[in-house]
A protein has these predicted regions:
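Membrane-interface "cap" regions at the ends of multi-pass membrane proteins
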Residues: 1-53, 163-166, 179, 185-188
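Residue-level recognition of pore/gate-forming positions within transmembrane alpha-helices
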Residues: 8-11, 46-47, 74-78, 118-121, ...
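Helix-loop-helix module between adjacent transmembrane segments
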Residues: 68-164, 234-239
């Protein structure tokens, strides 16, 4: 509980610091003062959520490191966005990327694109928000006897307040905080699970490299979902569609000082995400090793492995807190 409260307090401190020089004119662009490296870090955490924290390690037992093929496609997709879409948006000095649709195709297309974005973000955010609220209910509100509906309303109010306070500038800095927390969490989880397996750094690397689950590339069967070209090409087009044409994510890059800074932030973010996802996959492998050593059973087709290990009685309580 103290961890959760402390995190929200830290969010509000970051929000207050970010919003000190904000006004109505800079709410959507952040005054175009965001440093490229802050945008890069923020872009790492923006598409990653608690669902990623559970599902990516969870898929390793069934699909090995095949997800990395798609992530490599993500990195290529970020280059396409940086060199094709970003110059287009900056050249027209757009606040909303859907403003280009109005210039090119007219008002109806603009409104249609904006509404599709709005509806898709509501649905996606609803799923992520539900996962967060379920976790908060189990860890914090349920022990206090507080109903789930109160949990939902309080969480919505907190998110609304820290976002409203500074606009996109606050969003960028809080996403940066989230990115750092996520990366630290996965690194610490790897450390503590590795410690439970009596691995030093060399032993950990050796165990992961020799594991059957650490295979990355799959070229042998084109009909399989793990086939390289399916994953790689899907990754490229997914990032172009879900990041390059997404106002929520591109608004962060449009807050950069200029097109050069925006490109730099996107490219660094795309490359860094390869390493971050690699950490999640490594965590997945050592979780399967821990399950095997402790004789714990789980369904390989589900994402339950991290939760089982995190709350195992023999595991460090820190892993449960980080989870």
């Amino acid at each position: 509980m103290a961890t959760i409260i402390g995190y929200f307090i830290l969010l509000f401190v970051v929000s207050w610091l970010a919003s000190r020089k904000s006004d109505a004119n800079t709410a959507l662009t952040g005054g175009r003062e965001a440093p490229w490296y802050i945008v890069a870090i923020a872009m790492i955490g923006a598409p990653i959520s608690g669902v990623t924290f559970v599902s990516v390690p969870g898929m390793v037992a069934a699909k090995s490191f095949s997800y990395m093929q798609m992530v490599l496609g993500f990195a290529v997709g970020y280059f396409v966005i940086a060199y094709v879409l970003v110059p287009l948006f900056f050249k027209r000095n757009l606040v909303s990327i859907y403003g280009y649709l109005e210039e090119r195709f007219g008002g109806k297309t603009h409104k249609t694109g904006a509404w599709f974005f709005f509806i898709s973000k509501i649905l996606g955010a609803a799923v992520r928000f539900y996962v967060v609220c379920v976790t908060l209910q189990a860890l914090m509100f349920e022990p206090l006897g507080i109903p789930f509906i109160v949990n939902v309303l309080v969480t919505i109010a907190l998110i609304f307040l820290y976002t409203l306070q500074g606009g996109v500038k606050t969003v960028i800095w809080t996403d940066t905080l989230k990115s750092i927390c996520l990366i630290l969490s996965v690194v610490l989880c790897i450390f503590f699970v590795g410690q439970a397996l009596n691995f030093d750094f060399t032993g950990l690397c050796s165990a992961v490299a020799s594991s059957d689950t650490s295979r990355i590339f799959f070229f042998d069967n084109p009909s399989e979902g793990t086939y390289f070209w399916k994953q790689f090409l899907a990754g490229i087009f997914m990032v172009i569609a879900m990041t390059g044409l997404d106002q929520d994510l591109m608004q962060r890059t449009l807050a950069s000082k200029n097109v050069k800074e925006s490109k730099k932030g996107l490219i660094v973010s795309g490359i860094t995400q390869v390493f971050v996802v690699g950490l999640f996959l490594v965590l997945g492998t050592i979780l399967t090793l821990y399950m095997s050593k402790m004789g714990l059973n789980y369904d390989k087709s589900t994402d339950e492995i991290f939760g089982i290990v995190a709350f195992d009685s023999k595991m460090s309580v820190v892993v449960g807190i980080l989870f």
